[in-house]
Amino acid sequence: MFSRVFLVFLIFIFPLAYGEDLRTIKPERVGMSSERLAKIKPHMQRYVDEGKVAGIQTIIARNGKIVHFEQVGTLNLDTGSEMKHDSLFRIASMTKPVATTAAMILFEEGKLLLDDPVDKYLPAFKDKKVLVDGELVDATHPFTIRELMSHTGGLTYGIFGNSPIDQQYREAMFGENNTFNFRNIANNDTPESQLKTLDDLVAAIGPIPLQYQPGTQWVYSLSVDILGAVIEKVSGQPLDTFMEERLFQPLGMKDTFFEVPKDKLNRFGTLHTIDQTGKLIVVDRPETSDFANNVSFLSAGGGLVSTASDYIRYAQMMLNGGELNGVRILSPTTIDLMTRNQLTYDQQLKYDPRPGIAGTTGFGLGFGLKTEAPKTASGSKGNFRWAGIFGTDFWCDPKENLTAILLMQMIPYPQNVRAEFKNLTYQAITEMN
């Protein structure tokens, strides 16, 4: 069984009308083609037929109406149960935008400022040092809430690189002489995390030097997990309680949680990888998953389980400028702030250096952004998105009033499927805004 903390590091009573699903309509009513959208399902089926994934689910909404919702393949490889509209997925780092949105609720209430130093709320991060060319130097400034949200505060993840700071993170998470290696995933042989709560995380990495001076680089990191600890401190509530009361209930997200309830386990699938022989195998099972058994580590960076129907409500709220079905979560001005680029041009080039993409992609508060229309891919300037390590992905296109979600449970996932799904979505548009 995978450790829950390992999985999430990879990588988050109202009136009945609030819980209603977004209405499904004929695509032609919102400038899309039914015939062209029909290309998506057989394309995804090929991935299943070739044994590259167990199952895939896709959902698309335009102008606030669902125009496509399909799934192919198997939810649970052990039982053979099929994927359905209400299937539950480990959404991994798609948790990050949701948690950042929760923090912005506190921002709007005047309970925190984006330029507040993190050590104002979490003293373990006071007086940080930075490791520069093997020497410890003082940080130029305390890293801030904004730098947590934009992954520019000097933190790292510890599991994607091999710098001296990465090594210290791994020791803090998995112990000295740990055997962590992504190649071990296929053998279901990953080390157990020592960290059981957000407080454990803060205490463990608080003393570790920063990897770079705050504000100078973009490095994907545990920042949003630390933001989760800030949310708990400022709100005075556990992270799951705050997010349930302030986000999930108001938006009608009845199937989004950090721990899968026992009565919903039959809708929660297996997690998969490809073993050394090329065979699709199970590496996490619903009945033994740490996403379903006495969850104590509430990972704002990757701990949520959700459905396509729930997550598209969140995405549509963001696309609507902070409101869904008459329920306002945030002001349009706050959504605008969250989707502004926080990176310098040099940081953008390092953030996504791919040919044709470099310099057109930035990062806001919780989201990757398109600062320019891409030259080699579908999409519009102003798109915002994020994804997860198990093959989950979503994006919002304000120009075309379009949002789409791709869900699977695969590590590693097929690299091209996200771009292919995006192209298949945009080719179905017949009337541009």
Task: Give the predicted meaning of each segment.
Residues L10-Y18:
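Hydrophobic h-region of N-terminal signal peptides that target proteins for export
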Residues A38-M44, G64-I66, F89-V118, V224-E232, ...:
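Active-site SXXK
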Residues D21-I91, K111-L113, K126-E135, Q415, ...:
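Short, conserved catalytic-motif segment at the N-terminal edge
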Residues K129-S378:
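Short, surface-exposed loop or secondary-structure junction motifs
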Residues F2-V8:
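Sec-dependent signal peptide recognition
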Residues S33, K96, T307:
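Short, conserved phosphate/pyrophosphate- and ester-handling motifs at nucleotide-, phospho-/glycolipid
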Residues G73-T74, E287, M410:
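A generic structural motif
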Residues D393-W395, N401-M410:
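Short, well-ordered beta-strand elements
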